[in-house]
Every structure is written in structure tokens, then in C-alpha cells.
Amino acid sequence: DLSLSPRGRELERRLRDFLQRRVWPNEAAHADETAGARAAGDPWQPSPLIAQLQAEARAEGLWNLFLPDSPRAPEGLSNLDYAPLCELMGRVYWSPEVFNCAAPDTGNMEVLARYGSQEQQARWLDPLLDGRIRSAFLMTEPDVASSDATNLQCAIRRDGDDYVIDGRKWYASGAGDP
């Protein structure tokens, strides 16, 4: 059965309503804001519009919908219930950020939630879930086709109580993108 759960249907309705009221009407304003930041020589500055919409989305319970089965994100959904929400959010390239559902943060938060120590979760996962920081996933390496995240040469090994990461990364841009 690929039907949405009652909760999934309700969140889809609420998300569609939020997008219609707050995101879709602001596409031109976001484009103007982005163009202004670029013209001012600061393309990576945080967007005041997105910050405002994030506060509204959080207040309406439309925050961290992607993370299933986590005590830190009880709003989380199954992949089946989350998929139609992604489709709706995907209509505007920047809207997943409004709901704290943007890559690479979503994948990095999932990894931290599943495998991170309590210390790592407190230091990195909690601020990511709160939307206070952003993360990066740098998979570019000089000797492999790095658009495939399973095709990495970088290696990690245990050395006593520590881990040693050994590898080279290629230039990456956008790491400063809030």
C-alpha cells in the first residue's frame, strides 16, 4: 500500500498551503534579494527572506520533516510520507531550505543522528536541526569521477583511540553558502 498516512496527508495539505501563501508569492523577492547580494559582492550572505520564512515554517510545525525515527526530530516522516512533500518543495529551488530540508544538511543530519556520538550530536546535529549552522559534503577527488559518492578514494583507519583520514580533495565551491 503506497497510500499516505493520515499524518502525511495532513502535512501535505499544510505544506501546500504554506507554499501557496508564503513561498510561491516570494519567488521574485528572493530573486531580487539574491541579485542584490551578488551585486554588493557578497553572494553568500544569509537571506533575510529565507530566515523570515524559516521562522514561520517552524511556528507552523513544518520543520525537519525529513528525519524519521529520531528523538531529536519528532516531526520526522517515513520516506513514503516525505516523498510528496519533496515534490512540492522542489517546485522552487530554494524552498527546501525554508523547511530545514535542504541538501547536504539532510543527509549529514541523518548520518549524525544514526551514527554520531552524543558529543557529536550535541555539537553538530542539534545546531543543524535548529537551523543555526549549515554543513557540507565534499566528495570531489582529483583521480576519480566524484559525482558518485560511493566512488571515493579517501580512506579512514583506526590508530589506537584516534582515526586517521587519508586522501586528497579537489577544489570545491559553495562551502560558504549559508
Predicted regions and their residues:
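Short, solvent-exposed polar/charged micro-motifs at secondary-structure junctions
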Residues: 39-41, 76-77, 109-110, 146-149
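Buried hydrophobic packing segments
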Residues: 85, 89, 108-112, 156
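Amphipathic, small/basic residue-rich leader segments at the start of a protein or domain
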Residues: 1-103, 119-134
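N-terminal glycine-rich flavin-associated loop
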Residues: 99-119, 148
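Glycine-rich, Trp-frequent "lid" loop and neighboring beta-strands that shape
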Residues: 75, 115-178
